[in-house]
């Protein structure tokens, strides 16, 4: 009987240390992208902040987005992404959602608390929440 009691106490202690399910950490509450069309140019004002929140380098996010849009662009000193071409905010948000699913979200626990790691020619998403390591398609 005492071993069963100890087991239950250890389980209770374990569950008390686990994070609450559905609780959102810092990276979970992502800012909305601020997108402007000026003439034939599209600007994303808070691009650098967004990339910082998802723990990805600006150039990796930019490379994915520009490749999908088939348009040239660059990040300026203020952290704004400037894309040559007129694109709707809906198109850009859809592409960023795809980027999140493919290169940020942990496939095991669905957390956005991950880092992108490159070993030789392989890319991996390493989850900081559950420790899973998932291979992804190279950029």
UniProtKB/Swiss-Prot annotation:
Gene3D superfamilies: 3.30.30.170. This is Translation initiation factor 2 subunit beta. The keyword NAD does not apply. The keyword Membrane does not apply. The gene is eif2b. The lineage of its organism: Archaea, Thermoproteota, Thermoprotei, Sulfolobales, Sulfolobaceae. Heterotrimer composed of an alpha, a beta and a gamma chain. GO terms for molecular function: translation initiation factor activity. Belongs to the eIF-2-beta/eIF-5 family. eIF-2 functions in the early steps of protein synthesis by forming a ternary complex with GTP and initiator tRNA. It comes from Saccharolobus islandicus (strain L.S.2.15 / Lassen #1). SMART domains: eIF2B_5. InterPro entries: IF2/IF5, TIF2_bsu_arc, Transl_init_fac_IF2/IF5_dom, Transl_init_fac_IF2/IF5_N, Transl_init_fac_IF2/IF5_Zn-bd. PANTHER family: EUKARYOTIC TRANSLATION INITIATION FACTOR, EUKARYOTIC TRANSLATION INITIATION FACTOR 2 SUBUNIT 2. Keywords: Initiation factor, Protein biosynthesis.
């Amino acid at each position: 009987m005492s071993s069963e009691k100890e087991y239950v106490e250890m389980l209770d202690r374990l569950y008390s240390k686990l994070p609450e399910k559905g609780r959102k950490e810092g990276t979970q509450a992502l800012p909305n992208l601020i997108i402007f069309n000026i003439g034939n140019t599209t600007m994303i004002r808070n691009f650098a902040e967004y990339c910082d929140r998802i723990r990805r380098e600006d150039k990796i996010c930019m490379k994915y987005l520009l490749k999908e849009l088939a348009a040239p662009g660059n990040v300026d000193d203020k952290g704004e992404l400037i894309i040559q071409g007129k694109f709707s905010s809906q198109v850009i948000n859809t592409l960023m959602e795809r980027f999140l699913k493919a290169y940020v979200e942990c496939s095991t626990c669905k957390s956005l608390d991950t880092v992108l790691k490159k070993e030789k020619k392989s890319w991996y998403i390493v989850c900081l929440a559950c420790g899973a390591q998932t291979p992804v398609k190279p950029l």
